[in-house]
Amino acid sequence: MDIAKTLQKIAEELGGSFTEYSDNNLILTVPTKDGRFQGITTYILEHDGKKVLEIASRVCDADLPGINYRSLLEMNQELTYSKILIFDGYIQLASEVLAEHVNEVILKDIVDEVGHTADKIEFQLTGKDVH
């Protein structure tokens, strides 16, 4: 499967946009609720000799006052493909999958979950469309 072409098709199907920033950094922007948009970055990496897709979306700064971190951890139980985590100083939604085990349907489900859930949490925590 051509990951870039598949992600471009998914972005178009979701009414969003696609940018191939580099060979291993692909960016989708997808529409969410109430006219907001969410940026999703896919990194194509190699772990232990296997191609891995890391699909992530920033939510907000991890040190934003008033964050209930326990509540965020508990939300992980409700997610199918992604998890809430802190990386590079940001709360993010992220998913990793072996490229050889993913197909277009699953990839679209992952993008949908990451984008919409990140937007939902971002709006709950900040009241804004930040990322």
Please give the residue ranges for each predicted region.
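Short, internal acidic amphipathic alpha-helical interface segments
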Residues: 50-90, 94
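Short, surface-exposed beta-strand-loop junctions and turns on beta-sheet-rich folds
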Residues: 34-35, 61, 99-101
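Glycine-rich portal/gate segments that line the openings of hydrophobic small-molecule binding cavities
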Residues: 28-54
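Short amphipathic alpha-helical segments
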Residues: 2-6, 64, 68, 106-113, ...
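Charge-rich, low-complexity N-terminal segments
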Residues: 1-37, 86
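Charged, low-complexity, helix/coiled-coil-prone segments
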Residues: 8-21, 48-66, 128-129
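Residues that form generic nucleotide/phosphate-binding pockets
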Residues: 6-13, 71-75, 124
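Well-ordered alpha/beta subsegment
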Residues: 81-112, 116-131
